[in-house]
Amino acid sequence: LTSEKIFSACANRIRSLSSFISTNDLLCAAKLICEARICHIIGAGNTIPIASDLGFRLQRNGQSCMYSSLPEQYFNNIALGDSSDLVIAISRSGASTQVLKALSLAKKKEMKILVITADPNSQIMDFSDAILQINDTNEMHDQNVRADSHLLELAVNDALIYVIKNYPLFNFDDKLPTQINDVELL
């Protein structure tokens, strides 16, 4: 096992995302994000840092976001939200109890829901308006080693930021709201 094989395996895992997430899926997700009054970004356990990464980067690009490592905090934020808000739920298993509770509350508030998950048959799908599905064996090539990695979720974050910042490059008549470019980066 060499560093070259490790990085090659990581690159191949990221490359495989295009088999599950189409350009149209990314554009749909970007539009939901940019049209939202506020994005509530939620995760549990190992996906909390992924949610924080996406929230911070969206804020740096002009989108209002709320995210927290405390479920009670995101429950409160969603309870105070309205139907013009979007919840972005990140759950690899699609079965995180706190995430499912938050999505149930969001549905009652008639919020839109974008799901990033690896399990297309999980309960989280019952709540979704849009899905970005990752599929990852999380294994190194020709090895019996499983990486405890959320590389693909981070790659999806990167792709979403890229699409939001470069939406006009996709040559659609549809224009994103302009506030996304109004924030001066620090």
Regions found by a protein language model. Name each.
Residues 24-36:
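Glycine-rich phosphate/diphosphate-binding loops that line cofactor/substrate pockets in enzymes
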Residues 10-13, 17, 29-32, 54, ...:
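A ubiquitous structural signal for well-ordered alpha-helices
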Residues 34-169:
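Glycine-rich phosphate-binding loops that contact phosphosugars or nucleotide phosphates
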Residues 17, 21-24, 40, 171, ...:
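Short secondary-structure junctions and interdomain/linker hinges
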Residues 1-25:
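HTH-adjacent hinge/linker in prokaryotic transcriptional regulators
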Residues 166-186:
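A short, charged, Gly/Pro-tolerant segment at domain boundaries
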Residues 13, 17, 163, 175, ...:
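Residues that form generic nucleotide/phosphate-binding pockets
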